[in-house]
């Protein structure tokens, strides 16, 4: 980990993503959906942007925050758990915040949780005083223990955290949990959630004030158009003027109805709905006067 350093001038935006692992493929798919394409180098660590001056650097996920802090990369797609861990570690040694989460991306969800042996009777954070807690996220854990006023020993491990209590090297663990199957296999029970994590787009606290700043703004806008619309549906139908208010009451969770003129005295209406529309809901709209109902998926949009 290093303090923020001045990086050589660049006119191309550079994004760091995981070379391999659970975030790698979704990250590349998301950026491709934003209209980016690349030419890969022979070592497959650097991808030169062809559609736009936006290049990819393929690295380990725990290197991404440092690359942003040092100005080597402008943006990165990384788990919030990794970003928050390194940010907490920087603060604990007196370094300023050098990066921030700009957008949640809706994939790679997991939780950073305390897990105790199944025979424990969990009574709350005060119970942890004097215990040994194994974790790969020591900075987040130390910060949380300090907030709780609990004095416990943090045992830092780089992997296989869940086996530490069985080996006698720790009393409990603080680790990432997705399905919980690994905890159950090691006779551990989750008892407290420290962090809800997902993949995020991270960037420097201060955006570049050159051409890269404009590229960053454009990419953020495109990301919003892809991510925010992923689960939304465009609903289109016809209705007479006297049925519009009643139909709007059935769509209170949707965006305001857009009215478009149509032949025969009817209106063409459309709205964006937050999620799938069931057959039951469509039939309810039909009974209220909607005709020619159509539900369309939205691949991307610009607000």
From Swiss-Prot:
PROSITE patterns (alphabetical): ATP_P_PHORIBOSYLTR
Single biological process term from Gene Ontology: L-histidine biosynthetic process
SUPFAM superfamilies listed in its UniProt record: Periplasmic binding protein-like II (SSF53850)
Compartments in which it is found: Cytoplasm
Primary localization: cytoplasm
InterPro entries hit by this protein: ATP-PRT_HisG_long, ATP_PRibTrfase_cat, ATP_PRibTrfase_CS, ATP_PRibTrfase_HisG, HisG_C, N-reg_PII/ATP_PRibTrfase_C
Enzyme category, top tier: transferase
Superkingdom assignment: Bacteria
EC numbers on record: 2.4.2.17
Residues annotated as signal peptide: none
Swiss-Prot/TrEMBL catalytic activity: 1-(5-phospho-beta-D-ribosyl)-ATP + diphosphate = 5-phospho-alpha-D-ribose 1-diphosphate + ATP
A single GO cellular-component term on record: cytoplasm
Cofactor(s) needed for function: Mg(2+)
GO molecular function, one term: magnesium ion binding
Regulation: Feedback inhibited by histidine.
Pfam families, A to Z: HisG
Cystines in this chain: none
Pathway: Amino-acid biosynthesis; L-histidine biosynthesis; L-histidine from 5-phospho-alpha-D-ribose 1-diphosphate: step 1/9
Keywords: Amino-acid biosynthesis, ATP-binding, Cytoplasm, Glycosyltransferase, Histidine biosynthesis, Magnesium, Metal-binding, Nucleotide-binding, Transferase
Family named by the database record: Belongs to the ATP phosphoribosyltransferase family. Long subfamily.
HAMAP family with a match to the protein in the record: HisG_Long
Job description of the protein: Catalyzes the condensation of ATP and 5-phosphoribose 1-diphosphate to form N'-(5'-phosphoribosyl)-ATP (PR-ATP). Has a crucial role in the pathway because the rate of histidine biosynthesis seems to be controlled primarily by regulation of HisG enzymatic activity.
Protein name: ATP phosphoribosyltransferase
Record organism: Stenotrophomonas maltophilia (strain R551-3)
